[in-house]
């Protein structure tokens, strides 16, 4: 029996439970489930069917009650695996939690990335380590993530799939958060200085995530980016207290504003206390709101002697008001060696944000494309791809996007010297677009 058939049969078997919990809304889900079953019977298994089934499950779980979510997850796993499944998550973390057994020796094509994190999330007792509520202090530490370099598409943040009946993460196939070790601020700085001294480059890459992201997934994404970009320095993560719930967009908006001064202090630490030569910052989506505010307030020309230079600043799909971004860009002009903005005309999440706010977002392209002095704007519409089903994570999920970012970070090339992009128009309205 195929994995797809087994999952469809299991979903059909719990239909009475789902009908009771969804009420009148179950009718549309039932019809879609029957349509998927009919396609399997008619056409057999296919990549398209698996993709649609995955999307169906995602919608089902987003809108389900906690009782229904439990029924769905329990139906999709063997009895012996139910106790090892992390409630509320999408993959199993082997040996997660402080003080647990170490992971076995890793295969040659798997690398472990230490992600040095700062977070203002509230600590959690579970495998999530940090939850979606605001904490009283900024916590520091190292999250260790294993990343396979083979059997995974460049940019892909792999994890087990329910519908493939994968219930445990496999280091040879999946990006896994293997451990999280907290420490004091002083210990964090000392450890970072020590490991930076052994790096191939005396550089730091700081990643700040966007809306609807858990601490675990933020750490996994930071490590995946470091590996796929072939970054030769050390990796930092600032994880603000996103609620990690697509229905709580406005909650995340309030939290990123609250978190901005914590992020700014973390950037200051990276610049002035680590001994790094260069700091690169990559912000995604709503995380750009904290980044632009930090750039507004940090005068890199007035940093103490021996501080790192703020080298490459990357605004990836920024979910910030376009007019506000333009105003702030004038204030932080010249504070980094180079600023680059990646935009797209096919970003559904940004279009949804525009619908909510009534005004264009800085990450949109076409008529809304932001072109300002001091920022290299790249229209990534031609190579845009989807990681979340919303065409919103192309910055980390498309080969040519990653190649261009790698040229920025590793070779510090200006756009005219980068292979993937070409100039469109002339100054002062010049921007860059991907070659056909």
What do these predicted ranges mean?
Residues 213-217:
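Short substrate-entry loop that stabilizes the transition state in hydrolases
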Residues 203:
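Alpha/beta-hydrolase fold active-site loops
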Residues 1-23:
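Short terminal alpha-helical segments
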Residues 206-210:
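The conserved beta1-alpha1 loop
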Residues 4-11, 29, 49-53:
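Short amphipathic alpha-helical heptad-repeat segments
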Residues 17-28, 42-48, 62-69:
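Charged, low-complexity interaction regions
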Residues 77-200, 219-235, 239-278, 295-312, ...:
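Lipolytic serine-hydrolase domain surface
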Residues 283, 287, 291:
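Gly/Ala-rich beta-loop-alpha elbow adjacent to hydrolase catalytic centers
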